[in-house]
Amino acid sequence: MIDSELFKEILSIDSTTGKERALSDFLAERLAPGVMPVNCGKLRRLEVGDGTENLFLSWGRPEVVFCTHMDTVPPYIPPSFVREDGSQCPPEEAFEVCGRGSCDAKGQIVAMWSACRKLAAEGCCNFGMLLLSGEETGSWGAKAFAKTGFSAPFLIIGEPTENKMASASKGTKSFDLHFSGEAFHSGYPEYGVSAVELFVDFMEDLRALEIPEDEAFGKTTWNVGLLRSDNPQNILSPSLDCRIYFRTTKAADAFISEWMTRPRERMQVTPRGGDAPARYVTLDGFDSAPVSFGSDAPHLTGFGHKIICGPGTIRVAHRPDESVLVADLEKASDLYVKLYKALTGNNLSHQ
């Protein structure tokens, strides 16, 4: 069973990226050996270096590590628990749980913890649970953990995949853009250069671009954020800054990097890096599908085989109506136990 009270408690803590310490402090105390009915053999608190920390719970020497992240995107949204008819109810009676992190990724935490308790109760002693900070803004916790040198054969990362194994995930590419115009009275635009118009021209070129596609990953997509141009309405904009974020396919990953960094008049491009598209382990007998989001997986380099799966859907993650069905959490708990047994039974099918 999912620990509904634990779920309520962690959802009630604001762990927006940068504020994870409150949640990690709580979990370190709540999940410590001797506190829960099924003890973990060891709990380590690992500093990330930015004021946050990772938590690593282990039973023996882990061959399989369950992993997800403690941070959430803003804004913080307190939890609510509802019956199937939409009425409010106590946590233990809930059909659906709403609030920030309910599926991304605090729902993953409680589902994985439930699986760990089941495995420990069965006497298993070769698994662990890794809770990371900073996933939403750069995988800082994952990068810090990789530096510890820890290694294990299998990693199961919890993300909202509708309890399907992610067969592949798109890559990411991020660029900062600066457009340089020349300020002038807006009544005489022919004597100046509008940075806004330069940006619009660039966006028209991007929208018209024929970006390569591939069968496994589909289309490359992009989004513009951090858009700034502070000119008054009666002055041509002298500058505009923004960031553009691509979700790339294998066919388009190198193409996007080359196209974005071509020299252009009055435009500066600063690459911010990203992750390459990747394929992940799937197992026979388990549902699988590709996903279009990133995760900590590329940065956790000490693991031989990586699986991404978990309860909830990415279609509500990061939204104000983020939610997860309790039945999906229960299903995920059972799924994680089955995956553990399949992996330790050497039933790995392909990567």
Where are these regions (language model features)?
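Acidic/His- and Gly-rich active-site-bordering loop/insert found
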Residues: 1-101, 308
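Short glycine/proline-enriched coil/turn segments at helix->beta-strand junctions
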Residues: 2-3, 32-33, 42, 58-64, ...
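Structural motif corresponding to alpha-helix initiation and N-cap regions
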Residues: 50-52, 139, 293-294
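Short, conserved micro-motifs enriched in small and acidic residues
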Residues: 95-110, 135-136, 193-196, 323-326, ...
